[in-house]
């Protein structure tokens, strides 16, 4: 992949780190029969949430300790518990790397409607690779439009409807 650097030159490489936590999906998102409450079934369990946060911190620390910070850090969909966004922003700023992370489900509107949505967060720190590119760190949310078939089936069995978020963002940078 070639990208334009701030110098106008084409870079030969884009460094990307992918962090995959070891969440157990069945433990993280328990069935309605296990929880008795659909809201609990669509939220990551507290045990798996603690594990996910710990693993994310550990992986990011390990990456930082290599001395070779990536241009972009990816965390797949549903990998990041809700409420962990501020820590991700601080980590992106500390590492001077863009972070694209998939967040856990969130309730969509009136709880009586039993609707959930899913988003990712894109964090662009004000500094990339030692170079200031903006006056402050920017965050954007990108909505998910279609759930995977197995995901949609599990939500259906829980009595929950998936709210589509047909969002398209185009990111352009002369600094990468």
List where the protein language model places each region.
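N-terminal, active-site-proximal structural segment of metallo-dependent hydrolase catalytic domains
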Residues: 1-72, 78-79
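Cys-nucleophile CN-hydrolase/nitrilase-fold catalytic domain and related Cys-dependent amidase chemistry
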Residues: 47-142
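Active-site beta-loop-alpha junctions enriched in small/polar residues
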Residues: 21, 104-106, 145-147
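Active-site catalytic loop in hydrolytic enzyme cores
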Residues: 1-4, 113-176
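A generic secondary-structure signal marking the coil-to-beta-strand transition
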Residues: 12-17, 96, 138, 176
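Hydrophobic alpha-helical segments
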Residues: 29, 34, 85, 90-91, ...
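Short, low-complexity, polar/charged sequence segments that are solvent-exposed and flexible
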Residues: 35-40, 92-95, 159-162
């Amino acid at each position: 992949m070639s990208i334009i650097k701030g110098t106008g030159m084409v870079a030969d490489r884009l460094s990307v780190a992918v962090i995959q936590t070891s969440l157990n999906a069945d433990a993280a998102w328990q069935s309605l029969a296990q929880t008795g409450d659909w809201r609990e079934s669509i939220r990551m369990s507290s045990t798996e949430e603690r594990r996910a946060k710990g693993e994310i911190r550990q992986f990011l620390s390990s990456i930082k300790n290599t001395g070779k910070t990536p241009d972009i850090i990816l965390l797949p969909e549903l990998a990041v518990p809700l409420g962990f966004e501020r820590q991700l922003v601080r980590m992106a700023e500390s590492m001077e790397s863009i972070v694209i992370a998939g967040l856990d489900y969130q309730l969509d509107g009136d709880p009586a409607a039993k609707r959930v949505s899913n988003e990712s967060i894109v964090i662009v720190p004000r500094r990339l690779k030692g170079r200031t590119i903006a006056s402050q760190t920017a965050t954007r949310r990108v909505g998910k439009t279609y759930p995977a078939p197995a995901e949609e089936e599990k939500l259906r069995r829980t009595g929950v409807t998936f709210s589509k978020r047909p969002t398209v963002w185009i990111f352009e940078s002369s600094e990468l």
